[in-house]
Swiss-Prot record:
GO biological process, one term: tRNA wobble base modification
Full protein name: tRNA 5-methylaminomethyl-2-thiouridine biosynthesis bifunctional protein MnmC
Cofactor(s) the record lists: FAD
Record's keyword terms, sorted: Cytoplasm, FAD, Flavoprotein, Methyltransferase, Multifunctional enzyme, Oxidoreductase, S-adenosyl-L-methionine, Transferase, tRNA processing
Name of the coding gene: mnmC
Amino acid sequence: MTDRIVPATLVFREDGTVVSPLYGDIYHSAAGALAQADHVFIRGNGLPERWRHERAFTIIETGFGTGCNFLATWAAWRADPSHCERLHFVSVEKHPFAREDLRRAAAHIVAYTTITPIAPLVDELANAWPALTPGVHRLEFDDGRVTLTLVFGDALDVLPNLALRAHAFYLDGFAPSKNADLWSPAIFKSLAKLADERATFATYTSSGAVKRALDEAGFAYRKVDGFAGKRAMLVGEFAPRWRVRRHEPPRAFSTDRRDAIVIGAGLAGCAVVERLAARGWHVTLIERRERIASEASGNPAGVFHPMIARDDNLAARLSRAGFLHALHRWRALERAGHAFSRSTHGLVQLATSDDEFERMRESIDALGVPAELASALSRDDARALLRTDVAHGGWLFAQGGSISPATLAAAQCAAAGDRLSRIVGVEIARLERGGDGRWRALDASGATIAQASVVVVANAADAARIAGLRHAPTQRVRGQLTLLPPGSAPAVPLPVIGDGYVVPLANGVTLTGATYEPDDTDATPREAGHRENLERLERLLPAFSANALDAGALAGRVGFRCVASDRLPLVGELGDEAAAAREAAALTGARLRDVPRATGLYGAFGYGSRGLVWAALGAELIAAQIDGEPWPLERELAEAIDPARFLVRALRHGRVA
C-alpha cells in the first residue's frame, strides 16, 4: 500500500524564518529565501544562460518545501527574454504543506523581496495546489509553458520511479545532519540515472559525506562561495568516469517536422490532439464517422470519479492520478474559454451492502484520503443529500460528477485551433512507415490519406488491427444505456453510482445504465437491456419501481467499450513486434525498456468504462514521451499501461516467432 502523506506543520521563528518542528531545521536562510534560491540554485546551475540553448529545460529539486526555489526560477524565466520555450520543474516532497499553509509561508517570504513580479505567482501556485495524495501531480502555468511536476512521497522511493532527463539539479532539503536519508548515496545514484550528459547541480552544503556520495554517483564537484557569508557551497556537473546506468533517460522523438496523425476522434483521440497542439505539433485527426465523438464518446453523459481500494493497487493509483490530472486539464480548458457541459456538485457512490460500506469507510481512514477527494457518507447523510431513499451509505466524491463527452471532445479540438486538420468519413485500413521515416495512413484501396512523423492510434478496438499488433488482447464490450422521461425516476441532484449509475440530464430526463455484454456486436437498443437497467436502478434507488415503466417504449443508446484482458488501458509507444520476433531468443528475459519500439507509433486505447478518467493523463503521457519531457506519472504506473506489456509476456513464454 502507498504510504499516506503527512503534511508539514507551518511554524515561523521570531525572525520570520520558516522552520520544521519535525526536522528541527529551517527551510531557508534567515538572509532571504529568494536571494538564496538565486545565488545557490539558479546561478549555481549557470542559469538563465544555459536554458537559452534548449527548446525545453528540465530541473529536478529534491525538496519543494515552501516553493521558493520554484517561484524564484519561474520569475527568472519570465524575466529572461531569451528563455527556453518550455520550462519543467520537478520537485519531490515527503511532507508537503496544506494549501493555505503554503500560501501563508510563501506570501510571508516574498513580502520582503525586491523581486516585484514574484508576489502574484504565490497565489497562482497556491490556487493550483493539488490534493495531498501520494504520487505525481502536474501543474501548468503561463499557458503551459511552465510545468511544475510535484512528486509527493519519500525521495528514496519515488526518485527511482521517475522517467525524465534532467538538465539541472537543485539539491535542497534539510541539512544532512537533520535528514541524512535525503543526502544518501542511493539518492545520488537515482539522480545519476536521470541526468542529461550536460547536467549540472548546485547545493548549499559542502559536507564531506555529500561530496563522497556525489563522486560515487558520477558527479564532479567544486567548492564556490556560499550564500550570505557561508564559506562554501558545491556546484558541479554529471561527469561519470564509468558507466553508471543500464538505460538512458528518455529523449525527445527526433524529427525535422512536428506533425502527427491521430486516428479516432473520441475522448482518447481528442485529448491527444489538444496536448500535441499545445506543444506546437500540427495534427491531422482522422475519424471514420462523419463527426467527432460519434461512438462510445457520443453518449449523453459519462461519470467521472477515482477508484479507491484498501491496498491502493495499480488500478486505484492510476484512476486517482487520471482523475486529478483530468480536473486540472478541464479547468485549464475552461479558463481558456473552451467550455463544455459538466456537473460540478459532486458524485455519490453507494455501497451494495452494510459490509461494503464499512470497508469503504475503513479504506478512506486507512489511506488518509483527503476530504476534497473523497469522504464517507452515512445512509442518513446520503438520503438527505440525494433527497431520496437509499439502502446503504457510501462515498461522496466532491469533485466527481458527469460530463457530456462530445462537448469535451469539441472543446479539446477547439483549443487546438489552426494546428488541427480534420478528415472525417474515412476509415484507415493500415499504417506504413516509409524509407523517409514518415508514417502513412492508408485506406482499404491503398491510397495515402495522410502522412506524418508520428501516429497515435486512438480508435478503441480497431487500434490494434490498424497498427498490426498481434500481442494486444482487447475485447469489445457492448453497453446499453436507458433514457427515462421526466418524472419517472427519483430527481437526484447529482450523479449516483453503485450497481449501475443514474445521471440527471437537462429538462428532467434521467440517464441510467449500463449493460456489460462482451463480444455482442448488436448496435440496436433492446428491450431486455432496458429492463436490466431498470432493475439495476431499482436496487440503487429503492424509491424507483422497475415495473412502473414499459421497457419496450424507452429510448436509449448502445456504445462499445474497448477493454484489455487485464482491464488496464494501453497508452504509450507501441512495440515493434516484427523486430521482437527477429530477436526473440535474446529477449526471453526482457523488460519493457529492452523491447524494440515502433519508432513514432503510439497508442491510446483500451480505456473501457474509464475514458473520462484516463484520457487526459494518457494524452499527457504520450505528448511527454514524444517531446522527451518528464512523464506525468511514475514509471511503475506507466509500465502497467505500456502497450508492449503483452509483447513482453509473450516473449517470456516463447510465444513470439
